[in-house]
Amino acid sequence: MNDTFMKEKPILPLILSMTLPMVLSMLVNSLYNIIDSFFVAQISEEAMTALSLVYPVQNFINAVGIGFGVGINAVIAFHLGAGDHEKADQAATQGLELAVIHGVVMTVCCITIMPVFLRMFTSSEAVIELGVRYSVVAFAFTLIVTVSMAFEKLYQAVGNMKTTMISLMCGCITNIVLDPVLIFGYGLFPEMGIEGAALATGIGQTLTLAIYLVVYLVRPIRVHIHRQYILPGKKMVIKLYSIGIPATLNLALPSLLISALNAILTAYSEVYILVLGIYYKLQTFIYLPANGIVQGMRPLIGYNYGAGEHKRVSQIYQIVLCMSCIIMVFGTVICLLIPGQLMGLFTHTKATIQAGETALRIIGAGFIVSAVSVTSSGALEGLGKGTPSLLISLCRYVVVIIPAAFLLSRFFGAVGVWNAFWITEVISAVISLIIYRKSIAKPVTTARKE
């Protein structure tokens, strides 16, 4: 593959070649999320509630892995665009080294805090026990998650989306196949219940990492891991974290949001906590494909920005925004037309289904406009502008929605919380456009300094 294809290939075919593999793999991943929750829901409604309460911590682990991976991706893509392959190799080596450290620390911390964390949101001993049993197994694979995500972003940085797609799809499909086998037992496999769901996920994640490693050894890419760069360099570490920390916070903020909304909804009924948990499982089918487009966009934005191709950066942003809007239109339509059927996948309780129908119809009203915030935030990360990207996410997940949900719930109950979603998306979209335009207008020389 031509090293300069990211700045020479026609824009639309380039974007499609970079984003479609990621969209496909994200669709499979979102399907896994839904199927995994479907099987857990068959255990009991308490098991599904436990999964909903554990989700914010799982999301935090993923946020650290993906967020720091975004830093690796952006730094590598920028240096490749600038023609500095040594710095790109240094970023890859030290990025993977730091990913290992993150994985070890989070494994210990997350397993330790889970009992206390769960008791903050429920007094049900059955739910707490199920949550602890699930999290101990799931979080044992945290190191594999962080290293796997670092490799994912490394491959994306060099434009090798096919390897990422194949690795993610193999892991997800393995997970989907193993879920019912390990949860309910089949043949030689014993019935493991909720621990089976966690183990199936871990095995899928391990397979994904194994494929990345095999491909790296058999078919070397343009970026290499070298022993000479193992000793962390201060400038490189600062650069990785200057992008990785804001990106991590971007992705971790939903965990804070979900926990805050759970605390608000607890005052009304645990039914609404379950509804919120189901919504966050269902919305992955919309937002993960959109995220796939953004993942394909980041290295293109970073490479062309590093190469000084500012016009192409603007064109890439506009096309990706349109593609994201198309996905969000689809999400809005299905939430308006079949909310009851979607809720019925996870619960058979009539009251929960009715509450979920109302929630999905109201929240879905904000999907289309959310494409602006999602695309702008991803583009800024690709440009290495982590702080402006973080400001957008703070608006979406903290500054606007939490106060709005709290105030509206005082007047309208749980329905007020659902309305806070679309109100937040409208306000955040306006703020996102302002932040993006101001950030992109700044000179290149101030964007990234050695």
Predicted regions and their residues:
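Transmembrane helical elements of multi-pass membrane transporters/channels
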Residues: 17-36, 137, 171, 204-208, ...
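Small-residue-rich hydrophobic transmembrane alpha-helices
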Residues: 48-108, 112, 145-159, 163-164, ...
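Short alpha-helical transmembrane segments in multi-pass integral membrane proteins
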Residues: 1-19, 76-143, 189-245, 301-366, ...
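Hydrophobic transmembrane alpha-helices of multi-pass small-molecule transporters
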Residues: 60-63, 107, 175-180, 209-213, ...
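Residue-level signal for short hydrophobic patches within transmembrane helices
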Residues: 8, 12-31, 35, 57-64, ...
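Helix-terminus/linker motif at the lipid-water interface of multi-pass membrane proteins
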Residues: 27, 31-49, 118-125, 181-192, ...
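Structural signal for membrane-spanning alpha-helices in multi-pass inner-membrane proteins
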Residues: 110, 153, 179, 183, ...
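Short runs within selected transmembrane alpha-helices of multi-pass transporters and secretion channels
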Residues: 69, 73, 138-156, 164-172, ...
